[in-house]
């Protein structure tokens, strides 16, 4: 599939080495946000045979990292909590309710008073967690359910311990299980579609040998999950991400609006880019199946940039 889209799948580009057991993996979903049809889906690298049959796009649940800032914190804050992109939060030392400090990804200390727009553009952890704390994790969780996520945990007991995703770490994608690229992409497609969520579709209809329709999947299954004005504001802020923020590597055109959000989990176990143009929404996950961190060694094969490079290469090809 990658080769058909004009993207090389070789070890020189993406650091795969046949001498290593652990190999970096990737998954991608592309959807036409206007109707929900999935136009491309990649579940992993290489020919899908033997041990390569796992479809990571639909079956692998991974931490969404900072891609959840927009969905869990900022979307509900703008949509129903009376906040705007100009609402400010202080990027200063801040602890979760349990006392653990919230850490920013950047190592240059804190950046003081910043609006939500800047919090999105620069992917500021403390700003996102503070926003979710104000609007409450319960509201953020409810919005995520409305965005179509099915792998979230409301409350679950495991070996005598209680697990729940209704907490402050939700803002940074800190989940009990994780999400699939398939569902994450559908949520971002809702923003691209001016707040209307379309249940993603992998087929239009199924017919028998005589042409009789057995399954009809052409009827839209859609709902308004955020206001059009909220979608417009989020899109505007995420355009800044691509123009001058954490997603500049994804920019492939100066004539077409491109919006999106980067995402990394702790220790770079999961690296994402979810974004859209006026035509398609695409989400890319990269990481290792055994959950080791992606390499942060700079150079031609800088692994933590692969998700953005794949996104740009494929989206440029299809536009």
Identify the residue ranges that each predicted region occupies.
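A penicillin-recognizing enzyme superfamily signal
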Residues: 1-20, 24-32, 40-42, 47-60, ...
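Secondary-structure capping and boundary motifs in well-ordered enzyme cores
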Residues: 20, 27-31, 35, 60-66, ...
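Short active-site loop at a secondary-structure junction
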Residues: 24-26, 49-71, 86-89, 169, ...
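Active-site SXXK
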Residues: 35-36, 62-89, 119, 187-191, ...
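Active-site-adjacent bridging/hinge elements
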Residues: 38-52, 144-164, 283-287
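A generic secondary-structure signal for well-formed alpha-helical elements
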Residues: 80-84, 96, 135, 139, ...
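Conserved catalytic neighborhood of penicillin-recognizing serine enzymes
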Residues: 82-140, 167, 209-240
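Mid-domain, small-residue-enriched loop/turn segments at the edges of structured enzyme/sensor domains
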Residues: 100-105, 136-185
């Amino acid at each position: 599939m990658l080769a058909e889209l004009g993207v090389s799948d070789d070890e020189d580009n993406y650091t795969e080495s046949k001498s290593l057991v652990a190999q970096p993996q990737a998954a991608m979903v592309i959807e036409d946000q206007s109707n929900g049809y999935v136009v491309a889906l990649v579940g992993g690298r290489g020919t899908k045979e033997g041990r390569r049959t796992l479809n990571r796009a639909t079956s692998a649940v991974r931490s969404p990292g900072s891609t959840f800032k927009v969905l869990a914190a900022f979307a509900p804050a703008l949509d129903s909590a009376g906040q705007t992109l100009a609402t400010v939060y202080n990027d200063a030392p801040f602890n979760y309710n349990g006392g653990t400090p919230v850490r920013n990804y950047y190592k240059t200390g804190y950046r003081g008073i910043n609006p939500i727009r800047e919090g999105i553009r620069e992917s500021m952890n403390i700003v996102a967690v503070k926003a979710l704390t104000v609007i409450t994790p319960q509201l953020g969780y409810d919005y995520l359910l409305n965005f179509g996520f099915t792998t979230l945990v409301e409350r679950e007991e495991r070996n005598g311990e209680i697990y729940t995703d209704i907490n402050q770490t939700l803002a940074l994608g800190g989940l009990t299980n994780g999400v699939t690229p398939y569902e994450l992409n559908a949520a971002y497609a809702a923003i691209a579609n001016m707040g209307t969520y379309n249940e993603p579709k992998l087929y239009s209809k199924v017919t028998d040998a005589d042409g009789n329709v057995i399954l009809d999947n052409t009827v839209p299954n859609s709902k308004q999950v955020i206001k059009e004005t909220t979608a417009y504001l989020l899109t505007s802020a995420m355009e800044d991400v691509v123009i001058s923020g954490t997603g500049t590597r994804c920019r492939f055109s100066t004539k077409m609006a491109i919006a999106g959000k980067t995402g990394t989990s702790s220790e770079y176990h999961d690296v994402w880019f979810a974004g859209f143009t006026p035509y398609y929404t695409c989400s890319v996950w990269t990481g290792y199946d055994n959950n080791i961190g992606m390499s942060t060694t700079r150079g031609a094969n800088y692994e933590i940039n692969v998700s953005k490079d794949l996104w740009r290469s494929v989206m440029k090809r299809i536009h």
